[in-house]
Amino acid sequence: MIEEILTHHIIDHKLTYKLFGVIPLSSNLITLFCITIGVFILFTLIAKFRRPVLLMTAIEGLVVFIRDEIVVANFGEHGKKLTPYFCTLFIFLLFSNSLGMIPQMRTITGSISVTIGMALTSLSLIIFLGVKQNGLLGYLKHFVPEGTPWFLAPLLFFLEILGLFTKTAALALRLFANMIAGHMVIICFICLIFIMTAINKYAGIFTAIPSTGLSLFVNLLEVLVILIQTYVFTLLTAIFAGEAYAHH
């Protein structure tokens, strides 16, 4: 029983079937597909409403918040064209982080491979915007500040490149660690009930009450963590991309 709980929430299960006979499938990849299709269908249906509804009003408020507090704050007024990307990133992350709250579903951002993929997407955006705004040579120049002695230039360039990849790694690890931590704590409380029951059934009953209560409390905290980590990942991506975008 304990092994089933651990493997369901933590391990990405590989499937024998391959998409188009080439692409290997896993439970995380299928969940990613489902989230993408689900979000697309949901917002397509919402867009067809002629009259304002509560959900539409909430989404409009979210879009305005992302535009003003994340995009414009880091890119300026001319960066408003990036609002759709950051809205998509925020909503996709929100769904990905929240899915584990549903019974029998899994939080795909609790897999390091998924968070690395998302961080690499952010890295691609940072480099793309930096090169687009400043040109390839101009973008590379900002890694070595003007006035740097020639003998220090290679070292500074290496350190700046290393810093860029370090920030990307931090994005992936921060999201992964925060999303997996809550599930691990809940699993520990649940496993404690089974362990104590195996020792003595009365001890198991006595342990079940506080363990269940603490699990519910951690679940409530997880809702807050989901919102915070979704916002933090989106904001940090905007900050890093804005720094690359701003160099002239």
Curated annotation (Swiss-Prot):
Q: What is the recorded name of this protein?
A: ATP synthase subunit a
**Transmembrane portions of the chain:** 29-49, 53-73, 82-102, 111-131, 143-163, 179-199, 220-240
Q: Give one Pfam family.
A: ATP-synt_A
What job does the chain carry out? Key component of the proton channel; it plays a direct role in the translocation of protons across the membrane.
Q: Does the keyword Cell membrane apply?
A: yes
Which cellular compartments is it found in? Cell membrane
Q: Which UniProt keywords apply?
A: ATP synthesis, Cell membrane, CF(0), Hydrogen ion transport, Ion transport, Membrane, Transmembrane, Transmembrane helix, Transport
Tell me which stretches of the chain form a coiled coil.
none
Subunit description:
F-type ATPases have 2 components, CF(1) - the catalytic core - and CF(0) - the membrane proton channel. CF(1) has five subunits: alpha(3), beta(3), gamma(1), delta(1), epsilon(1). CF(0) has three main subunits: a(1), b(2) and c(9-12). The alpha and beta chains form an alternating ring which encloses part of the gamma chain. CF(1) is attached to CF(0) by a central stalk formed by the gamma and epsilon chains, while a peripheral stalk is formed by the delta and b chains.
